[in-house]
Amino acid sequence: MDYNMDYAPHEVISQQGERFVDKYVDRKILKNKKSLLVIISLSVLSVVGFVLFYFTPNSRKSDLFKNSSVENNNDDYIINSLLKSPNGKKFIVSKIDEALSFYDSKKNDINKYNEGNNNNNADFKGLSLFKENTPSNNFIHNKDYFINFFDNKFLMNNAEHINQFYMFIKTNNKQYNSPNEMKERFQVFLQNAHKVNMHNNNKNSLYKKELNRFADLTYHEFKNKYLSLRSSKPLKNSKYLLDQMNYEEVIKKYKGNENFDHAAYDWRLHSGVTPVKDQKNCGSCWAFSSIGSVESQYAIRKNKLITLSEQELVDCSFKNYGCNGGLINNAFEDMIELGGICTDDDYPYVSDAPNLCNIDRCTEKYGIKNYLSVPDNKLKEALRFLGPISISVAVSDDFAFYKEGIFDGECGDQLNHAVMLVGFGMKEIVNPLTKKGEKHYYYIIKNSWGQQWGERGFINIETDESGLMRKCGLGTDAFIPLIE
């Protein structure tokens, strides 16, 4: 990757001098080293002032760590004030550009160092945040040494990331309890930013990443908090489950002798998918997956657009574990035994707040008669004729930072997340090597991480025309609720 500058370092100095010195002063004064020192000092002091304002814990600014979403916020004014000077911006950009050029020049040496040491337990294998090429600076061993918001060199090398982190805090209403916690989160943020940037510079990938609300979490933290699907066990004695032996009978009822196009079908275009929701800080993906497919059945079979209560399942599905995870099939089992589910208006979602089961909150409930296990080689057929499917998938940190495109990244090492399969499609993409168009098939997945994640809450995962390619174990567990 090449980082090009539109100007040379000496041009920055000249332009800054012309801005700060009166136009009537003799031109020889512009070359004086004292002027250069003043300019640099002003830039450094501005950035240091920004950091002092944001990262010094005191009584007036303690709200930053406990509540960063203050309505009457002067943060934008401070950021704009610091960045409105063309001289200050050019100076900082030149420093960042210089640092990035250094990073690229050292990349190969660092990779060789990593391979030679084969140290899989390092906190972070990557390039130093500083510019000295010393072994102690090639890796982050001591975050307190590297993350120093009062170090001018650190600020100059990371001004862009610091501003990016500030915007991340504000956009996602992040709350940190102390400056030390903020430093730790900033370190994780930098590591995730590095991964995202490296991926997005790979022209051979079919998808793009972005820093989202998970950017200050390690993958281990993210997995423990959001990937809560439990290992599935066959329900041999279930009186509600129609197993794969019953599949042909059910599909014949809805399909008949009709053939279908294996290239594309999207239930979102046929009023069969309700809006994307957000499970927030609760490991309740199993509830959102199962409730979502029930909502789709009522939309398709009854022409009713309803929003049902995931919270009732979280509170009352005793075969599952609330915010600590669960199983899709257990959700359907309990849904039937509860006699149906209230609407979200009657039983609203409160995420991880403690809530006792209260099945009497509503008089009208929406239930299912039974549910069907879908063979993993019949996903496209079942999706086309029966409707959206509640499925399992093995999620990784690549998946977590998905932005757009067809996901062809790394998968998790086990099934850990419940989502909905709502469609499939095909897109022709030009191969950057052959310069020829190639057909790429994908499944359309509805997630439960809000509409700000991915493609408005959805992700496209690569497959083949037949749908037999099931990346990330997609559809290993696959169930459709039946209301007729």
UniProtKB/Swiss-Prot annotation:
Disulfide bonds join C282-C323, C316-C357, C342-C362, C411-C472. InterPro entries: Papain-like_cys_pep_sf, Pept_cys_AS, Pept_his_AS, Peptidase_C1A, Peptidase_C1A_C, Peptidase_C1A_papain-like, Prot_inhib_I29. The chain crosses the membrane at residues 36-56. Its EC number is 3.4.22.-. A motif (Arm motif) lies at residues 428-437. Disruption phenotype: In early trophozoites, the food vacuole is swollen with the accumulation of undigested host hemoglobin; however, in the subsequent stages the parasite recovers, and parasite development proceeds normally. Induces expression of FP2B/falcipain-2b and FP3/falcipain-3 in trophozoites. It is an enzyme of class 3 (hydrolase). The active site is at C285, H417, N447. Glycans are attached at N67. Cysteine protease which cleaves native host hemoglobin and globin in the food vacuole during the asexual blood stage. The binding to host hemoglobin is pH-sensitive and only occurs at acidic pH. Cleaves ankyrin and protein 4.1, two components of host erythrocyte membrane cytoskeleton required for the stability of the erythrocyte membrane, and thus may be involved in parasite release. Preferentially cleaves substrates which have an arginine or lysine at the P1 position and a leucine or phenylalanine at the P2 position. Component of the hemozoin formation complex (HFC) composed of falcipains FP2A and/or FP2B, plasmepsins PMII, PMIII/HAP and PMIV, heme detoxifying protein HDP and falcilysin FLN. The HFC complex is involved in hemoglobin degradation and detoxification of heme in the food vacuole during the asexual blood stage. This is Falcipain-2a. It comes from Plasmodium falciparum (isolate 3D7). The gene is FP2A.
